[in-house]
């Protein structure tokens, strides 16, 4: 059976007069867009515009809910109860769903952002609260979470279809978690290294941790990042190398 992979990217992260990333350039290269819902980034105008751009490029649309922390870009942990987590996810799904409705497109998936994503990957109660909110909002949504973590197992437990996410440009700890962005070795900046990591994850279902440990994982979707001065070249090369290996690039 021919291998396939989804390429997802976090988009719609501008806010007011502040621009972020090159969404219009990245969109034609990916298959799924995770659109910020106004808490960590994005606003009503940006959400509507990004939904329209994704529709124009025939890209699968998903919600990218985060913690209410614009200044910290949703990357700082917050001490919240599971009920507060549940409510903030519902709130953001409702916001993006409204813009999908008026543009006559369907919201297909949900991927938590930043600290919310990391908290859910390590904390069962938080993972369950996120997953339950998604299920209660729309049980047909696909839940995107870090492979081999509580995000995936709790989403499966509540009855959601899941997509295990891997990262081409992030390094992994020995336990399969992502290396914290606070550490200098968290990201892979060398394009060739990122391509080799992506190919290994898709072709072999394995990744090598920063300490050299081989970790088994399932790869349904690869996250690529649209920000940074070499982002366009980076995404283009990863896509091209995957296709050279005969891997189909298609949405979830």
Curated annotation (Swiss-Prot):
Query: Which transformation does this protein catalyse, written as a reaction?
Result: 5-oxo-L-proline + ATP + 2 H2O = L-glutamate + ADP + phosphate + H(+)
Q: Which SUPFAM superfamilies match?
A: Glycoside hydrolase/deacetylase (SSF88713)
Where does the source fall among the domains of life? Answer: Bacteria
Q: What Pfam families does UniProt report for this protein, alphabetically?
A: LamB_YcsF
Keywords carried by this UniProt record? ATP-binding, Hydrolase, Nucleotide-binding
Annotated Gene3D superfamilies: Glycoside hydrolase/deacetylase
Q: What is its EC number?
A: 3.5.2.9
Q: List, in alphabetical order, the GO biological process terms annotated in this UniProt record.
A: carbohydrate metabolic process
User: GO MF annotations for this entry?
Assistant: 5-oxoprolinase (ATP-hydrolyzing) activity; ATP binding
What is this protein for, i.e. what is its function?
Catalyzes the cleavage of 5-oxoproline to form L-glutamate coupled to the hydrolysis of ATP to ADP and inorganic phosphate.
User: How does this polypeptide assemble, per the annotation?
Assistant: Forms a complex composed of PxpA, PxpB and PxpC.
Family annotation (PANTHER family): 5-OXOPROLINASE SUBUNIT A, UNCHARACTERIZED PROTEIN YBGL-RELATED
Family affiliation = Belongs to the LamB/PxpA family.
Q: What is this protein called?
A: 5-oxoprolinase subunit A
Gene field = pxpA
